[in-house]
Amino acid sequence: MPRKGPVAKRDVLPDPMYNSKLVTRLINKMMVDGKKGKSQTILYNAFDIVRERSDKEPMEVFEQALKNIMPVLEVRARRVGGANYQVPVEVRPERRTTLGLRWLVNYARLRGEKTMEERLAYEILDAANNAGASVKKREDTHKMAEANKAFAHYRW
């Protein structure tokens, strides 16, 4: 742990095509072995597929999808008197976005389409329409928090 106080949060630069920090964060989440160029190409091609399929701007569709994926509540383990309780807590805005992007990429990777571009595009389209595995993950997270509402008084 640093002795000089909290470490400053590094800000990402907006991407060149859409001028969005959110897109840059998605590119960074998708990146494997430091190959950012490849990640960028995949994302931009996925956005082209989104544009073809939905007849809307890909950024609008992506932002709607992310809004549908981001969780509001989650559970965190809290040990009280020898027992572990799943305590529901509200998700901070920064973590909300991070989880949304992480789930989007992870569940896109698990899809059955042939290329990553197609997988990502269809996961974004599904999420924008409140369907898909990443939205289901958010629903499951919320259900878990709802089921453990009785332990809400243990939150810290």
Curated annotation (Swiss-Prot):
Organism of this sequence: Bacillus cereus (strain G9842)
Family: Belongs to the universal ribosomal protein uS7 family.
GO biological processes: translation
Keyword vocabulary terms for this entry: Ribonucleoprotein, Ribosomal protein, RNA-binding, rRNA-binding, tRNA-binding
Disulfide bonds: none
GO cellular component: small ribosomal subunit
GO molecular function terms listed in the Swiss-Prot or TrEMBL record: rRNA binding; structural constituent of ribosome; tRNA binding
Gene name for this UniProt entry: rpsG
SUPFAM superfamilies documented for this protein: Ribosomal protein S7
Taxonomic placement: Bacteria, Bacillati, Bacillota, Bacilli, Bacillales
Highest taxon of source: Bacteria
Subunit and partners: Part of the 30S ribosomal subunit. Contacts proteins S9 and S11.
Record's function text: One of the primary rRNA binding proteins, it binds directly to 16S rRNA where it nucleates assembly of the head domain of the 30S subunit. Is located at the subunit interface close to the decoding center, probably blocks exit of the E-site tRNA.
Protein name: Small ribosomal subunit protein uS7
